[in-house]
Amino acid sequence: MDSFKGGMNLERLPESLRPQPSHDMASSFHLQRSSEPRDPIENSASESSDTDVPEKERSESRKTREDGGAGSAGCTGAADDPAKKKKQRRQRTHFTSQQLQELEATFQRNRYPDMSMREEIAVWTNLTEPRVRVWFKNRRAKWRKRERNQQMDLCKNGYVPQFSGLMQPYDDMYAGYPYNNWATKSLTPAPLSTKSFTFFNSMSPLSSQSMFSAPSSISSMNMPSGMGHSAVPGMANSGLNNINNISGSSLNSAMSSPACPYGPPGSPYSVYRDTCNSSLASLALKSKQHSSFGYSSLQSPGSSLNACQYN
């Protein structure tokens, strides 16, 4: 009884006398025991899943960031590729002497060849048409630069001395009208009182003769017919004598006057002599015409008179 009161000790009983548990109890016990250790496993799995989720999210976010960075880098690289290609300089074309001679000869003939001509040149020189076009473009730029430099050199060497030469007369502008001694300062200018003006010396004898011969011709034309034909030759001879005297005096004054500063000293006198001789000949012809006109005008009334009128 004590044993029953104190509890049944199953360990002291032999295995044959031990009560065998039923199948239901075993299954329930097994399920209970199997369910008990699964709780911590599930808890541990849940805990591990709770801890792994942020890590996975972090890893995924890192992967997405890395992928995005790689994509952006790829985009920037793709965007930089054309720039790199543009920055890369093309290799220079090395022309041979024969090609350069052919191109230079064509450039001397035509500085702006068209498309067909460039293609022909490319065939001749064994080059491509773009290379020929670029060569002509560079050659035209070089030619324009050379032309500008030459013009600048001409301006510097040509116009500066002329400007300095034009600035010289301001030193002695009112020192006696020294018009012809800009380059030669050693020549002393003549004073104003002794300097003869070239206006009267430059007058041709033809104009002076015409000035002085006009009154004689007018007087001979306006003479009355009653003075007779003897007055007409006298006036013509006096007019010729006056013309000779005037022409001689004008030539002597021209010879004695200083040379004209704006022309060679010996060239005008031969022209004056020729004009003088020609003017004298023309005046002689005019005087003969006037004399013949006077004779006819004087003789015409006498021929109309009858013999009875003289009585």
Swiss-Prot record:
Molecular function GO terms recorded: DNA-binding transcription factor activity; DNA-binding transcription factor activity, RNA polymerase II-specific; RNA polymerase II cis-regulatory region sequence-specific DNA binding
Record motif Nuclear localization signal, residues: 284-288
Tissue: Expressed in primordial Rathke pouch, oral epithelium, first branchial arch, duodenum, and hindlimb.
Residue ranges of the region described as Interaction with PIT-1: 148-277
InterPro entries, A to Z: HD (IPR001356), Homeobox_CS (IPR017970), Homeobox_Pitx/unc30 (IPR016233), Homeodomain-like_sf (IPR009057), OAR_dom (IPR003654)
DNA-binding residues (ranges): 88-147
Intervals of motif OAR: 278-291
Residue spans of biased composition, Basic and acidic residues class: 53-68
Family stated for the protein in its record: Belongs to the paired homeobox family. Bicoid subfamily.
Protein known as: Pituitary homeobox 1
